[in-house]
C-alpha cells in the first residue's frame, strides 16, 4: 500500500512492480493517480479499512494540515503485526512515539524512516532505541545523483520556456494544498 500517489508514490509503485509485488494499492486525496501503476486506488477516507489489510505501507506524503499525524496511535493499531512501515515523504505524517511503542511492543514487524521530526533527531529520541527500525538521514531521494539533477534542471527549463512564451507553467505549487 502506498499512501500518496504523486511522483514519489508512483516511482515507488513502479519499483515494487519490477520486483514482483502481487498487488499495489494507492491512496490519495482524490482516489486517483496521474499514472496507471496501481492495481487499486482509494480515497484517503478509506485509509482505516485499507490499513487492516496492509503488509507493507510506504508513506510518500507532503507536509500539510491534512497529513500531519495521519499515521497516529489508533491507525498504527489497525496494521497487522507482520506489517512494515516505510516513510520517504515527511516526518510529520507519523506520530513517532506511537510508532516506537508499537515496534518495541512487537505490534509491528518493522519500519524504515528516511524522514523524522526534527531532523536530525536528538540523541534522546525514542526512535533511536526502537526495535526493528532503520533510520536514514533523509537521503532516499538521491538528490545528488546525476539523473535526479538532470530531471530538476529539465523541469526548471520547461517552466522557464513556458513562462517566456506566455504559456502556463507545469510545475506549480498549490499554496492552498501545501504542495
Describe every region a protein language model picked out.
Residues 24-26:
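Short beta-strand "acidic-cap" motif of Rossmann-like dinucleotide-binding folds
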Residues 15, 53, 159, 163:
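Short alpha-helical functional segments enriched in proximate histidine and acidic residues
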Residues 1, 78, 134:
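Conserved beta-strand segments that form the floor/walls of ligand-binding pockets within enzyme
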Residues 22, 31-126:
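Rossmann-like adenosine-cofactor binding region
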Residues 9, 32-33, 142, 179:
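Flexible, glycine-rich phosphate/dinucleotide-binding loops
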Residues 5, 51, 149-153:
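Amphipathic, non-transmembrane alpha-helical scaffold segments
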Residues 82, 88-179:
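Rossmann-like dinucleotide-binding domain for NAD(H)/NADP(H)
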Residues 1-17:
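Glycine-rich adenosine-cofactor-binding loop
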